A protein has these predicted regions:
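An N-terminal hydrophobic leader/cap segment in hydrolases
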Residues: 1-11
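Conserved HGGG/HGGXW glycine-rich cap/lid loop of the alpha/beta-hydrolase fold
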Residues: 20-67
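Active-site loop/oxyanion-hole signature of alpha/beta-hydrolase fold enzymes
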Residues: 59-101
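Gly/Ala-rich beta-loop-alpha elbow adjacent to hydrolase catalytic centers
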Residues: 102, 106, 110
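Flexible "cap/lid" loop of the alpha/beta hydrolase fold
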Residues: 111-115, 122-152
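Conserved alpha/beta-hydrolase catalytic His-Asp/Glu region
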Residues: 152-210
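Acidic catalytic loop of the alpha/beta-hydrolase fold
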Residues: 219-223
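Conserved small/polar residues in nucleotide/adenosyl-binding loops
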Residues: 230-233
Length: 233
């Protein structure tokens, strides 16, 4: 199934270029922001199911990631969020209420967007959120992917990294996940990690007027159980 071919593609301003959005369905607007080194396909198993429930599913390629052009300076959560906010408000009528969902790096950008949306925001929902400040690194277990690698080495590195960082069960590290990871990594220009390591999401929480919902995986290595929840408290 070609999920992308069934979407409507829209473009909004992004630095000196364009930000790319994919849209499925009609109804209540819900906006999804993907994680670092990703694109809209982080949500590929969710978009059509959610659209079928009566939502207008609007999924970003964040600035400097996926098919979107580079954001230009400042390379901060605020600078990127301003572009995303402009895109959302360009795509939707002025009086639209919006549900916003962010994954990992996308939750940090989403927090700043949530502040800007003010009373238009219906809910802010984060999955595997970053933006709580520095956290224990697992870099020693990760393999840096570089141009000198053979294709087999690139595949092995990507699969190792997904097993450590993204997918707790090895059987889920299949051909589709590996292709997505390498394809998105090759296109990534925005350095998401420095932004993810800030406290920008934590700082934004008191300013977000809508209900906030958060979920982390029980086996999520980046948070070591409930450590980020304890920080937020």
């Amino acid at each position: 199934e070609d999920i992308e071919s069934r979407s409507q593609v829209k473009r909004t301003l992004c630095g000196n270029g364009q930000m790319v959005w994919h849209i499925w369905g009609e109804g209540v607007p819900i906006v999804f922001l993907h994680g670092g080194h990703g694109d809209w396909s982080h949500w590929c198993r969710n978009v059509e199911q959610i659209a079928a429930e009566g939502f207008k599913v609007i999924v970003a390629d964040l600035p400097g990631l996926g098919a979107s052009d580079d954001p230009g300076p400042p390379y901060t959560a605020e600078g990127i969020a301003e572009i995303v906010y402009y895109g959302i408000t360009s795509l939707l009528p002025e009086n639209s209420e919006i549900d916003l969902v962010g994954f990992s790096f996308g939750s940090v950008i989403g927090a700043v967007v949530a502040e800007k949306l003010d009373i238009r925001l219906k809910s802010f929902n984060v999955v595997g959120a970053a933006g709580f400040g520095p956290r224990e690194r697992i870099a020693n277990s990760m393999v840096k992917i570089h141009k000198a690698m053979s294709e087999q080495e690139r595949i092995a590195a990507a699969q190792n990294n997904m097993r450590w960082l993204m997918l707790a069960h090895p059987e889920n590290v299949g051909e589709l996940a590996t292709f997505m990871q390498l394809f998105n990594t090759d296109r990534a220009r925005t350095l998401s990690r420095p932004i993810s390591m800030t406290t920008r999401l934590l700082d934004a929480l008191p300013n977000i007027l809508a209900p906030v919902n958060a979920v982390w995986g029980e086996l999520d290595r980046t948070v070591e159980g409930l450590s980020l929840i304890h920080i937020s408290e």
